[in-house]
A protein has these predicted regions:
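Leucine-rich repeat
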Residues: 102, 123-124, 145, 166
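Conserved hydrophobic beta-strand positions in leucine-rich repeat
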Residues: 67-72, 92-96, 113-117, 126, ...
Length: 177
């Protein structure tokens, strides 16, 4: 009995220390920090334009409310890492023209309709699997060698000039004009 009481007291003390030492984070909230948004320029954009209550966390409602991210309009050209972008599940338009990204994985972003990565001269890899609502893609003036648009069945316009493309897969993109 004495050992059980001691174990219970230790457990209670540990729980209290954890509760006092760790700030509460509601389920589903995403911290706007270097772990979730490694790129400082993107993190600043998210803080300024997506974190509506300025608590340095994105609630599910804040993530769902973001339908357009336009770095070009805001004259942001120093983003090198788009990690964290997939938290915005209702994203319809992503305009990152002229930024420093080398890879962009948007696979599974089923609501994305318009993507503009033109002028991202360091962009080597673009993944769009599962972007079934994508209708417009501008990937001109990048450094792409392959572009796989398989499964982007809603595509109507694609611009991919001024790349080093050796392979272009448009299978299933029957609406292209």
């Amino acid at each position: 009995m004495k050992h059980l009481k001691k174990a219970f007291c230790l457990l209670l003390a540990a729980v209290m220390l954890l509760a006092l030492g760790v700030p509460a984070m509601a389920a589903g909230e995403i911290p706007v920090d270097a772990e979730h948004f490694p790129d400082q320029a993107l993190r600043t954009y998210v803080t300024d334009y997506c974190d509506m209550n300025k608590d340095n966390k994105l609630s599910a409602a804040e993530c769902e409310a973001v339908q357009c991210i336009d770095l070009f309009e805001m004259k942001i050209t120093k983003v090198a890492d788009m990690t964290g972008i997939k938290h915005f599940t209702n994203l319809r338009e992503l305009l990152v023209c002229g930024n420093q990204i080398t890879a962009l994985d948007l696979s599974g972003m089923a609501k994305l309709e318009k993507l503009d990565v033109s002028g991202c001269s360091k962009l080597l890899s673009l993944k769009l699997a599962g972007c079934s609502a994508l209708t417009q893609l501008d990937a001109s003036s990048c450094a792409l060698t392959t572009l796989d648009l398989t499964g982007c069945s809603a595509l109507k316009t694609v611009a991919c000039s001024d790349n080093a493309l050796t392979a272009l897969d448009l299978c299933g993109s029957e609406q292209l004009t």
